[in-house]
């Protein structure tokens, strides 16, 4: 806006543009360095305000646009009134809410034009103007901060990072709020986090899909039953319908569903969103397993780093001892002896780690080749021997070491020899069933808890005061110890 001077009296510059300058020709005087600082601070304030407001929805942006238009019209009216009046000695333009960049440039040019007419003013006046400018700019900054604080009151804070209500950014009323679910807006209940799936389906799909179409599918019914079972909420309580004719509530009416159902409903309505959900789940599972591997590797790296630190320390000590040849030889011999101990410890540790790694095998991707260890109770009846034959020794238990793909055939052969046999214990997964049973048998025989079969390495009897319950407990303990990762 270009300000014209009156022929009778000097015009008074508005507080919003001059930030507290004096009336008359003195109010038009400011140094070029003050003007550049003035323009730079204005740009930082309004750029910051624009950046903060862009994160809110289109309703806030529309409101700000209408405010800017009304502010521009107000400035235009003031300009015409100043030019037409010859007797008015003072005028005042209200401070606009925001000065667009094109008006900011025009304002700067006008001030530069006015400066050329008052170059002979004293430096003291310029100093006063700069002081007033700083005060008013600080006031403007405070106003911008107050605006941002008022907007931040709409955001709902929650201490639980897994609560779905963390997506809320603005309240509609005491029950319903707006939220951002992925890349689109949703309506969410404040007290329980239920989301309006009717509106979501309308938003994400171009086809005429309805919520009841999804709910009637067999997959949806099974999912609803599962969510109800896990959460303890009745099936009817997983959905809340808001049906009202009120104009105010039209925006929020529809069916609100439990948060655990929403990803499946939206994936059904939008293939694009379904792909995003698959990507998130796959990334989560991959990262989870990756973190486990990283922890295992880190444990080994820490041990190696500790050994390396010890060796480095010894090497450093060796380099520091060079006072005399005798003393040096003595120190070297001592350090060599210690180094040999460390190296021996390192080799022993490395051997143990290698052995542990071979046994600590992760789960196989092929279930058919996974091993199982099954302890069977034979329940055989004693058979009277024929004349001239020795009585056949009866064993109470048999250890079966099988793979999943041959389990059926192995069990058939067992039941053929032991029709009344029953399962006592099953280890569903073990890296090596043969190795596990050999280790169990060796420990149980040494502790005099079982008597092994003479010709069969898998048949055995329990010794007195050693029960079947204790047998199961010991085998599980040995199995868990083998699968435990090294510390």
From Swiss-Prot:
The entry's keywords: Coiled coil
Disulfide bonds, paired cysteine numbers: none
Chain positions covered by the region annotation Disordered: 1-137
Compositionally biased tracts (Low complexity): 22-34
UniProt feature, compositional bias: Acidic residues: 47-77, 111-136
Domain KilA-N: 175-284
Compositional bias ranges of the Basic residues kind: 1-12
Stretches of the chain forming a coiled coil according to its record: 290-338
UniProt superkingdom: Viruses
Protein name: Putative KilA-N domain-containing protein L37
Organism, scientific name: Acanthamoeba polyphaga mimivirus
């Amino acid at each position: 806006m270009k300000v014209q001077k009156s022929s009778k009296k000097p015009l008074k510059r508005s507080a919003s543009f001059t930030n507290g300058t004096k009336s008359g020709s003195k109010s038009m005087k400011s140094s070029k360095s003050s003007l550049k600082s003035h323009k730079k601070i204005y740009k930082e304030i309004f750029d910051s305000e624009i950046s903060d407001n862009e994160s809110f929805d289109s309703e806030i942006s529309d409101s700000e646009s209408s405010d800017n238009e009304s502010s521009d019209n107000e400035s235009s009216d003031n300009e015409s009134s100043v030019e037409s009046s010859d007797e008015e000695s003072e005028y005042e333009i209200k401070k606009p809410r925001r000065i667009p960049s094109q008006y900011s440039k025009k304002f700067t040019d006008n001030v530069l034009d006015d400066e050329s007419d008052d170059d002979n003013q004293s430096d003291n006046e310029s100093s006063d103007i700069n002081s007033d400018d700083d005060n008013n700019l600080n006031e403007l900054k405070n106003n911008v901060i107050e605006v941002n604080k008022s907007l931040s009151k709409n955001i709902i804070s929650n201490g639980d990072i897994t609560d779905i209500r963390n997506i809320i950014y603005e309240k509609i009323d005491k029950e319903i709020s707006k939220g951002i679910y992925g890349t689109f807006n949703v309506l969410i209940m404040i007290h329980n986090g239920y989301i309006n799936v009717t509106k979501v389906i309308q938003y994400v799909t171009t086809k005429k899909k309805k919520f009841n179409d999804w709910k009637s599918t067999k997959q949806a019914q099974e999912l609803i039953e599962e969510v109800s079972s896990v959460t303890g909420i009745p099936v009817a309580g997983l959905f809340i319908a808001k049906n009202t004719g009120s104009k105010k509530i039209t925006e929020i009416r529809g069916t609100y569903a439990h948060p655990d159902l929403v990803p499946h409903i939206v994936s059904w309505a939008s293939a694009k969103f379904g792909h995003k959900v698959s990507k998130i789940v796959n990334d989560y599972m991959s990262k989870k397993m990756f973190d486990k591997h990283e922890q295992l590797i880190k444990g080994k790296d820490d041990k190696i780093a500790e050994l390396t630190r010890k060796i480095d320390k010894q090497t450093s000590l060796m380099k520091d001892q060079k006072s005399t040849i005798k003393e040096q030889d003595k120190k070297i011999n001592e350090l060599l002896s210690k180094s040999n101990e460390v190296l021996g410890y390192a080799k022993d540790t490395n051997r143990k780690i290698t052995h542990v790694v071979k046994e600590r095998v992760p789960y196989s991707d092929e279930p058919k080749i996974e091993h199982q260890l099954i302890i069977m109770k034979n329940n055989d009846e004693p058979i009277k021997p024929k004349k001239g034959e020795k009585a056949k020794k009866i064993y109470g238990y048999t250890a079966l070491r099988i793979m999943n793909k041959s389990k059926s055939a192995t069990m058939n052969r067992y039941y053929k020899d032991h029709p009344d046999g029953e399962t006592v214990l099953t280890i569903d997964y073990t890296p090596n069933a043969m190795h596990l049973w050999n280790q169990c048998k060796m420990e149980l025989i040494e502790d005099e808890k079982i008597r092994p079969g003479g010709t069969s390495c898998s048949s055995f009897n329990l010794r007195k005061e050693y029960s079947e319950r204790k047998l199961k407990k010991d085998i599980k303990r040995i199995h868990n110890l083998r699968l435990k990762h090294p510390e």
